[in-house]
Amino acid sequence: MTKILFICYGNICRSPTAEFILRDMLEKTGLKDKFYVSSAAVSDEEVGNGVYPPMKKLLLAHGIDCSGKTARQVTPDDYGRYDLIIYMDEINHRILDCMFDHDPDGKLRNLLDYAGKTGAEISDPWYTRQFQTAWDEIQEGCEGLFRTLVEKETVTLDFSHCTNLKDLYNELRSRMEWQDWYGETLDALWDILTGLPHKGSFFVIIPPNESASESVKKYASRIRAVFEEAGVLIS
């Protein structure tokens, strides 16, 4: 499981919004169990307070409920707990870099870097009062982050060229930790999907062409069903 921590100054506007936007994306795509997402503040000024009402209103307008979320302050121990620690501006970055001993494992990231805006900051709407602007920028960053997370862990199986069962087996062997296995059952495939070689991976299956034989289509459907049951299929 990949663990992600969003950071802003007070943990009542930007970072909780990013937390819940990304959670929503992961839930809608069936990936929520593959990631743990949270948020925190670099300051202690808002500890215990809920999401700032204008940002909470924007979340609700998009069907996202952030009830129960309260601000907390980031701690040095969080560096070991999370795989990615994503900040909103350079002030956040400087504080985190100092707290985490200059980021020896390279975990610190700027959110808008994921949107192709290297070094760009998301201004604190508590001061600017530009809540919609902050929302738009956070959403853009989260969309880029989501694509990066999914692409990093995604394996594509292309059955569109398969004309017989041997082609299907060859595609599985070439793209997965797949042994020379043939048979009518798919128990081996289940073991591979849920075992260590592909732990944390997601899969995209490109189906056979319409011109493929019925036996190929039928077997490809059975393979797809195993991926769905294992909870690792994106599309």
Write out the residue ranges for each language-model feature.
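A generic local structural motif
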Residues: K69-T75, L96-D97, W190-I192
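Phosphate-binding/catalytic loops
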Residues: L84, E90-V150
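Short beta-strand scaffold positions
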Residues: Y87-M88, G183
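Positively charged, polar, low-complexity stretches
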Residues: K152-S235
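Conserved active-site segments centered on acidic
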Residues: M1-R81
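Conserved beta-strand segments of alpha/beta enzyme cores
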Residues: Y36, D65, K107-R109, E153, ...
